Amino acid sequence: NEYTAFGTALHTVCEDLLTEHVNKDVDESELFTVEFRKEIKKLDVELRKDMIVSMFEQGKKIAPITIPYLQEHFGKFEVFATEEKLYEEMEGLGGYLFKGFIDLVIKTEDNKIHIIDYKTCSWGWGKQQRSDKMIAYQLVLYKHFFCKKYNIKPEDVETHFCLLKRTAKTNIVEVFSTTSGPKRTKNAIELLATAVKTIKNKIHIKNRLACTSGFGCEFYRTK
């Protein structure tokens, strides 16, 4: 949909600004416009024209300030990787592999490694999203398998979400850091293992929300 296209376009621009366009005089807003048009053309759904017009303007505001914000927030850094691919074996699960892509990995002057995941959103994240352990577990697992891949000490790696806010008037770009210590890592790995075993054993958990009108059940509130 439009939201996915918007997020993909911004991700691409942020990646390109730190790789092929680094230290070049480029128009970030124009880069976004080009990428967003590409993504829109791929959509095989009816588009809301008013939303598309708004997204063009919103993206053109976000694109020029994202990388400068990261540079201000983290200080001088070098890019370790963009779109870092993880394809690592999950211990004790019979050869199953963890697959993921980290948006951005940087190394700061204090020799810390920072794993960053871009999240496009409307006005930002509320308290519930910021405290949601399931959201945080994404980065926790990224860190665990990244450290395993490169044999890096976990204490040398920090994790962050970079919020790119479409409709916010202020703080349009924000870095939100998450904890990823030993206890949280252990909990995330255990939850992942449980999920894999559940799927492997073909155990299907009933979705009780499917019994509501929101899911279009034809028998909702019938005898």
Predicted regions mapped to residue ranges:
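RecB-family 4Fe-4S metal-dependent nuclease core
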Residues: 1-223
